[in-house]
Each structure stands twice: as C-alpha cells, then as structure tokens.
Amino acid sequence: MSRQGAFFSGWLVVLSLSAFPAFAQTAAPNHTGFPKLVTGGGVVRFGKPLVVDLDNNGGPKEIVVGACVNSNTSNPACEDRRLYVFDNAGNVRLGWPQSLPAEPYSSPAAADLDGDGVLEIVIGVGDAVPGEGNGEVLAFHASGGPPMWTFPVPGSPNGVASTPALGDLDGDGKDDVVFGSFNSNVYALKGTTGLPLPGWPIFVRDTVWSSPALADLAGDGKLEVIIGADSHLEGAPVDTKSGGALWVFRANGSNFPGFPQFAPTSPEIVGFQSSPAVGDIDGDGCPEIVIGTGQSSSAAGKLLHAWHRDGTLVAGWPVTLGGHAASSPALGNLDTDAALEVVITDDTAFLYAFKGNGSQIFKVKPKSAGGADAVVIGEPTIAQIGANNPAILVGGVGFDVTILSKTGTPISDDGTHGGKLTYTTGHPVAGAAVADLDGNGNLQVIAASGSSAGSEADLGVYVWNAGVAGALPWPQFHQNSRRRGAVPVTGGGCALPNPPLHFFTLSPCRVADSRQSANLTYGGPAYTPGEQRVITFTGVCGIPATARAISINVTITNATVPGDLRIFPGGDGSPGTSAINWRAGQTRSNNTIVPLSYEGRGHLTVQADLPGGQVDVIVDVNGYFQ
C-alpha cells in the first residue's frame, strides 16, 4: 500500500525544516493590506493558495486557503480546520471562514458548478490514518455559508490529499469534480449534486496522493482524466504489480488506449505521488503527460517520466533526478521555440528544468533569504514579470519564496540578476502563486503559511508587488483555478489516428453458453434480471491480443419473461441500445460487431435486462478486427 513512504514524502514539503527565517537584505514590497496575520487562524501546512475571481465578473481576485489550527506543535493533529477567503486588500470576505470536518491536505479549486455565473470552491479533506474515516470533499458557494454539497468518502483510510480537478465530463456544460482518495479509488462527482457520475468511482488498487489532470488527449473535444497512484504487492487484492501506475480514463470511466503505464519495477515501493502535468513538450502539436515517481531509494523512485498520449515514452525520457519527485511538474516556454519546458523539484531541495527531449537545462539548489542552501522546496510555478524579462520560476524555499531566471540564476522582480530578491514569510511555504490581483496590469506573488515559526495557531497570508504583468504559463499549483494541470494545445490537428481495421474470419467457435455448467469457461447458470457477466476473448478461439473488435452471434433461449440483452466493451458504461430483444418463450439470434475494451484484456460485458425470471445466453465468435 506504500502509505508510510507516501505520508513521509508528503510532509517533506512543509514540515521537515530546521532553519528559521532570515530576512532578505532588500525588503520585498508588500501589497496594500498584506501580510494578513490572523491570530488563532491556523497555518497552511500542505495546500497551496488558490487565486481566482470568484464573482466571475473580471474584477479583483480573491485568495482562498485551507488552514489547520494547532496550538500544540508536538501533536500534528488539527484542533480546528477552516477555509478562508481573502479579498485583494487582505480583508476576510463576508461569509468566511467556514469550518472543515478534517484537515485540508489538498488545495482548493474553483469553477461554476451550478451554472449561475458565480464560482464555487471545492476542497478535499482527511488523512491517511486507518480508522479515522474523515475523508470528505466539500463544495461551497462563493458567498460562504453551509456547503452546497458534501461527499463523505467511504472506507478507511479515506482521506483526500488529491486536489480536486474541475471539468465537464458528462457534457452538460457544467464542471464536474474529479479526485483520488486513500481508499484506492478515483472519483468523478456531478458538479451540481456531488453524486458519482455513471462509470465512477474506479478502483486503482492502491492509495492515491496524486492530483488529477484533465485534458483532451484524443482531440475530440472531450476531457480525459490523468492521475498517478501507488501500486505495490503488499496487501493488494488483485492484479497489482510493484512500481506505481499512471492511469488515464475517458470521461465515462473506461480506460484510455495505452494506459495504465507502470513505473519500472523495483524491490522497493515506488509509486506515482506526483501530480501529472499535460502539455506539448516536444513541439509536435499534441499533448504529452509528465509525472515523477517517489518513495523508493532505488533509481526507479527518482525518475521523471514523459509519455505520449498513446502510452509510448517520449524520446529522451524518463530522466533521472537526485531525489524523489512527489511535486507536480510545471510547464512553460522558457525559450523561443514552440515546445514547453518542464520544471520540477525533488526532495533533496533541487530545482530542475528540462527540454522536451529530456536534456537538462539546469539543476540548482535555491538559497534562502539568508543565503543558506534550501533544505526542502515546494511546488514550482512559472510566470513572466515585465514585458522584456525572461520567464521566471517561483518556488517555496523553506520559509521563503525565491525567484529564478530561465537559466536557474537568482533574479529580482525588476529583472536584474543582482537583486536576488527573496520573499520571506513566517512559516514553511508549500508553494506560491502569481497573479494580477487588482486587474491593473501589475503582478503580485502570493503565499500562505503561518505568522511565526514557533506556532501553528496563527495564519499568515503574504502578497508582494512584483512588477508589470507578462505571460503566466503556470502561475499556480496545477496551472489554473480549476486545477486541471494542463496547458491546452492550440491549432487543432491532434485527433488520434484511426487506421483502418482488417477483418479475419474464424470458424464459428462457442465462447459462452449459460445452459452448460461444464466444458466451457463461461457456462451456467442462466442470466437473472440486471446481471452482468464479463467475457474475455483474448486467447480464446484464436483471437489475438491485438484484436480491436469481434464479430459474434448471440442467441437467447429459455426466456421465461420478455427482455433485452446489451453487449458492450468491458470497462464502458451500459449503452442505451440492445443487441437483441425477445418475448417470453422465444429463441432468437443476432449477429453483432462489438469493440473490445481498451484495457488490453479483450473484455466484453453481457448484461441481461428483464423484469424477472431468467434467460439463457449463447455466444459464438466468427471473426475479429485488427
């Protein structure tokens, strides 16, 4: 299950720090109303600040943070948990804070879930401790007050460290909510109700720390869900290989072609606890997926991967890091070509930048305000301050937020390399954001942590003025306020190829017959109302693993009541049309062509829809497509 290693690496970002803050020689210019120090307000330990225009009217932006109140630093448990919303002048917005039922390990996200034109805030809570049973996802209206809806996550442990990603999966024009849980499931909830969408949740066999990315990989205008998970033999119930898995699902919950992909096997626990980033890193006009591994002390646990959307590795990847990469990569154009570069931190406090071919641009250890090497650094973000200045990187360095140029050298907010400006807070920083809070064309750097080093009782929200606004390729955790983790590909022409399939005839071969209880893998008893049975065709009757669809003759007989039969790819949802219909007492046959599942296992699902009674089903295969 790899929870111990996962829990430790999660704490590294914000808690495994011994250095206390040292103030920069040149004071950073505070934005009016900041820093905002809230006595008894708690500290932001794991989440990153959300910067968003909640009113969705083009006006000033708000800052949203989840905080843990803990007056006893020797006990990591929170005494109180709160969700805050601050305006651009540092005032707590009317209707806030709101109480949370457990600690917010995840970061808040925002989108218009109900279609009223104003955004809602979504956050996940709960930890990895078995028996706690405190995992939950909550949605709040921008005005505050009681939650719009809550979704208690079943099982134990059931915490949600996975930051929810918001996007329209069911095609109704409103965003839905996607996240993973420590209960080994990935969920997609209807944005308006908080109830699971058809085809979800999906069991991914081990704990999920990774935050999902949402991106159109197929080029068909629909979002796919991309997420990492732990994957280890210890205690796993089914079909698990040691190494960690990168999963990609279609909006209906079925597997996307070419996935899951697994990390290299290792005698130790590996796992994808990094949150994937999606964008065009090789300049081919199509999105790639970038994600890091974590936990294992072997080389397999210190890799940064990049996959094409068909599941093949991008040339030059994976690359080896000096430590585990549990953070999310950030993507941005650091040079003049069309491809995005990749920036990531590891748990040895190094910051890396790579080109799309895997070549390293730099590897640096940022320094604190006092000039000491960083011990631990948080999530990177990428922005451009000033029309003529290079893209810069902003990362949490202990108590500080530091700025580096595209070559990894320190840089001040005016673009000079001599200033080496570092912003200092009163507590460890998990990550920063860059935004134009006021809408006046000037950027601010935003961080949230605590107000003093020795206390976890007092909240500190910090905002510094940082110069004229430029491009913002990756300005906050997981790229945007919906936390989709993707830089959209523009220009089109990226639909997945659909090569012609060739048909191969087979002598009729019986695969399933519910009248028999012996001699066939898929025998009796008869089907009962609503029953689904999964049939594997790969390796049966000469069907190869490369088959994409099959031609089958389906016969029903001994029907005691009228009904219909539905046949569909394994992993897909049940279709609205039937393959065959019948009346009581009839025997009927029909030939149909059905795609096989994209899971690489050649599955079909047979579902009997009848109001009562039973029916026998016979399946004969007579050909396949590949």
What positions do the PLM features span?
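Bacterial N-terminal signal peptides
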Residues: 9-21
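Extracytoplasmic/lumenal domain signature
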Residues: 24-493, 565
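N-terminal secretory signal peptides that target proteins for export/translocation
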Residues: 1-7
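Short edge beta-strands and adjacent beta->alpha junctions
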Residues: 493-626
